[in-house]
């Protein structure tokens, strides 16, 4: 099972492909992981994620003690950072693997089972990943690590310096995914903006996205986790000119006051952020901007927070998430600042930001009523088929609920297809509509 972000999920999918090439039957489902081997891919980003990871490991350790599992392995960010401590505290785990040595688990499984008849032709390297997402969308991880060293962030301490994946490898992987029926590529990295600087000594994100857009069968390409400093502006031309590159950008801005941006070591000012946002909106009309904010960082005054709230109202982001500061071992903030804001104040600030965003979202969603939007369908729930527009990423954004009684027939809406949907009503984070036509 996988905890944490979509970047972790890609690692799990790669491991599953290697295991299946040896004849193992893998299930990405904790309810199925009984009787044989369990592998937990952990997150170690913030306190809540670490707690979830440890609790999950303990649950599976108990299952092993009860005889429900033969072996238990743990990999990922938590194991990368705290392996020695965890080995002593949770001896039920057979072996721990970090962020970069997890494929050594293959060596640990000395005697693989005999391949089943359906798997006899499957050889190592035949497929790069076992896709655990719905077949019509997948994640393409284009780099590891981060060089930014923001004050609050432990990711560079876990994953190391930014390392781009060679472009040709990414193109081959994306072509393979398209051949599997993937229609939506969610391009992910801790820092999309830096792609190519290490390998090619220049920004190569625009070139990469242009080449991905040429792959037959890819209907949407979505960009996640751009960094505002040293932003690769030519990507905006690609987003405007290429029909299958979504007008959607996930760019984490974190705060809005100069004092907090400096304290957070973001290497950008509010004025520079505002100019960047203006340029993005001018170059890509109608773009959906998603951002993430961090509140309760040491030194955030009430005046800082009020200015942040005013800025959120001013900028009118289409999608927004807010998180409370969590002190992480080894970070600049943990070493140099006192965690001086009470937890209840942090949570109140998160709630207030989200109340502001809820009102913004309600207005923006209401403006879609009466429009016909292109929607990719994800799943069925009762008498609705649930889908998303180009402005919505899987699992984190808004959804479109399409009226679709569960009767078979000529007008049935299929999962994993594009349709034109007439929007009839809206709620704060959801749209409701009916079939207009199949794209």
What residues fall within each predicted segment?
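Short flexible coil/turn linkers enriched for glycine and charged/polar residues
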Residues: 133-136, 146-148, 245, 255, ...
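Proteins enriched for Cys/Gly/acidic motifs involved in redox and nucleic-acid/cofactor modification
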Residues: 1-195, 234, 249, 271-282, ...
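Active-site lining segments that contact anionic ligands and/or coordinate catalytic metals
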Residues: 218, 246-248, 284, 288-290, ...
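Terminal RNA-binding accessory module
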Residues: 333-439
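Conserved, mostly hydrophobic/aromatic
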Residues: 150, 170, 187, 223, ...
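Conserved SAM/AdoMet-binding glycine-rich loop
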Residues: 70-76, 81, 179-305, 313
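Active-site proximal loops enriched in glycine and acidic residues that flank catalytic Cys/His/Asp
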Residues: 189, 225, 253-255, 291-295, ...
């Amino acid at each position: 099972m996988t905890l944490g972000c979509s970047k972790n999920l890609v690692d799990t999918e790669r491991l599953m492909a290697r295991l299946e090439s040896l004849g193992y039957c893998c299930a990405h489902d904790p309810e199925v992981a009984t009787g044989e081997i369990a592998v937990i891919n952990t997150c170690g980003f913030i306190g809540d994620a670490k707690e979830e990871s440890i609790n999950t490991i303990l649950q599976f350790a108990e299952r092993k003690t009860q005889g429900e599992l033969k072996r238990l392995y743990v990999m990922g960010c938590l194991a990368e950072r705290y392996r020695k401590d965890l080995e002593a505290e949770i001896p039920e785990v057979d072996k721990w693997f970090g962020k970069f040595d997890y494929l050594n688990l293959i060596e640990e499984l000395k005697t693989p089972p005999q391949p089943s008849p359906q798997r006899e032709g499957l050889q190592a390297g035949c497929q790069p990943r076992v896709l655990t997402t719905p077949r019509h969308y997948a994640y393409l991880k284009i780099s590891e690590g981060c060089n930014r060293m923001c004050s609050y962030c432990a990711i560079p301490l876990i994953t190391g310096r930014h390392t781009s994946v060679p472009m040709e490898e990414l193109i081959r992987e994306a072509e393979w995914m398209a051949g599997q029926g993937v229609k939506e590529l969610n391009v992910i990295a801790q820092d999309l903006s830096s792609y190519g600087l290490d390998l090619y000594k220049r920004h190569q994100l625009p070139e990469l996205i242009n080449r991905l857009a040429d792959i037959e069968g890819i209907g949407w390409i979505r960009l996640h986790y751009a960094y505002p400093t040293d932003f690769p502006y030519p990507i905006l031309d690609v987003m405007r000119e290429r029909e299958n590159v979504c007008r959607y950008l996930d760019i984490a801005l974190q705060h809005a006051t100069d004092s907090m941006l400096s304290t957070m070591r973001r290497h950008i000012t509010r004025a520079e952020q505002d100019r960047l946002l203006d340029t993005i909106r001018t170059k890509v009309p109608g773009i959906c901007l998603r951002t993430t904010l961090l509140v309760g960082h040491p030194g955030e005054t009430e005046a800082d927070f009020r200015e942040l709230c005013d800025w959120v109202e001013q900028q009118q982001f289409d999608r927004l998430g807010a998180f409370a500061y969590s002190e992480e071992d080894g970070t600049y903030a943990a070493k140099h600042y006192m965690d001086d804001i009470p937890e209840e104040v942090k949570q109140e600030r998160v709630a207030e930001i989200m109340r502001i965003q809820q009102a913004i979202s309600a207005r923006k969603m209401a403006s879609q009523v009466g429009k016909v939007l292109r929607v990719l369908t994800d799943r069925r729930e009762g008498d609705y088929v649930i889908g998303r527009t180009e402005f919505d990423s899987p699992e984190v954004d808004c959804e479109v609920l399409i009226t679709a009684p569960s009767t078979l027939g000529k007008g049935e809406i299929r999962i994993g297809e594009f349709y034109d949907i007439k929007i009839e009503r809206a709620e704060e984070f959801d749209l409701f509509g009916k079939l207009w036509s199949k794209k």
